[in-house]
């Protein structure tokens, strides 16, 4: 059972009703697998519903039904997918202890059923959660454990996930050079060992690095073109197109930028990428070209970490140099504050771990 054993009576009734309703879909055995996840077609609608409700308590009930029906049909992959839902739910609730349990449960069934991609999905989900919580030291430590296991398994997807995750971690810590090294290593590993996978996101990440950090726009544009050629989904094509817009803007190729921007915005709307940081910066670039500085500032307000930097750039383009200097100073103060908080977070995490280890030793000696 995927839902906690201490459920309320109401939850038990809901679970039974959910089971009865959804069982209609899987009343007849089916071996067809004409869906993206290659699970039994009778189970796929249940998974879709569970996935859509993954942030709600009801999602746990649907996941429980999915698991029970997957057991009946002997679909081991669907059983693993059912265990992903509780992990997603508890991550949305920011419940560390239940996240740990849900992750462990997913790892165990994935290994038992020989679907190791979901074993490493559990690791990656935990790591990204801790990164979003500004607990990058813990994320880094978990990534190291994940790496050891991936190499022990000799599992290409696991090894690739570890390398890419290290890139995410160092990017979140502001070490963009080391992050890019890991992204390049992950890309090389994917192209060699997983040629059927989509490398476009890594190409786009490297394009961003060369655009932002190295100011090497020719190399950045080359990575954008590779991303566009290799992308297998419209969403990844849109992300690569947005990055290409930003490079063209920096190169001063305005006519090409305008054409690229128009196409990128249309694709982003279809893929619901409105909150994308890169897209917001592309909007700001277009506003600056059209001298729509108020709209540019409104877009910059939607950015968290890069907002102050963009405000400074907009004021500079508008030739309002006093405000440009003012916001640039604020941006650098924000960077210093973020770095200090990161160090304090690392120290707090270390102290917690040392305290836990000391308590273990005291219990052993007692």
State what each model feature region is.
Residues 30-84:
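N-terminal leader/linker segments that initiate helical-solenoid repeat arrays
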Residues 37-44, 301-366:
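Hydrophobic positions within repeat-based interaction scaffolds
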């Amino acid at each position: 059972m995927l839902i906690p054993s201490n459920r309320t009576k109401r939850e038990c009734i809901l679970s039974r009703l959910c089971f009865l309703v959804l069982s209609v879909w899987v009343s007849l055995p089916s071996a067809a697998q004409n869906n993206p996840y290659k699970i039994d077609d009778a189970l796929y609608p249940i998974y879709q519903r569970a996935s859509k409700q993954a942030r709600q308590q009801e999602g746990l009930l649907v996941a429980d039904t999915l698991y029970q029906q997957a057991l009946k049909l002997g679909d081991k992959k669907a059983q693993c997918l059912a265990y992903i839902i509780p992990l997603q739910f508890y991550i949305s609730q920011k419940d560390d202890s239940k996240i740990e349990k849900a992750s462990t449960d997913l790892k165990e069934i994935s290994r038992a059923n020989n679907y190791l991609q979901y074993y490493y999905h559990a690791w990656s989900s935990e790591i990204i959660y801790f990164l979003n919580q500004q607990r990058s030291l813990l994320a880094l430590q978990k990534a190291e454990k994940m790496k050891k296991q991936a190499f022990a398994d000799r599992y290409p997807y696991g090894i690739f996930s570890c390398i890419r995750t290290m890139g995410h971690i160092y990017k979140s810590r502001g070490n963009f050079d080391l992050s890019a090294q890991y992204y390049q290593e992950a890309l090389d590993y994917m192209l060699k060992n997983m040629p059927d996978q989509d490398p476009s996101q890594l190409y786009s990440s490297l394009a961003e690095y060369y655009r932002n950090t190295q100011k090497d726009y020719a190399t950045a544009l080359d990575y954008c073109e590779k991303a566009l050629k290799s992308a297998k989904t419209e969403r990844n094509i849109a992300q690569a197109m947005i990055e290409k817009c930003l490079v063209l803007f920096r190169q001063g190729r305005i006519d090409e930028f305008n054409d690229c921007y128009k196409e990128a915005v249309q694709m982003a709307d279809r893929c619901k990428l409105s909150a994308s940081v890169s897209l917001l910066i592309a909007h700001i670039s277009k506003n600056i070209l059209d001298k729509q500085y108020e709209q540019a500032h409104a877009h910059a307000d939607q950015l968290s970490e890069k907002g102050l930097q963009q405000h400074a750039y907009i004021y500079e383009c508008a030739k309002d140099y006093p405000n440009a200097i003012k916001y640039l100073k604020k941006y650098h103060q924000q960077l210093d504050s973020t770095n200090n908080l990161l160090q304090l977070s690392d120290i707090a995490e270390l102290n917690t771990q040392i305290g836990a280890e000391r308590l273990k030793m005291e219990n052993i000696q007692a």
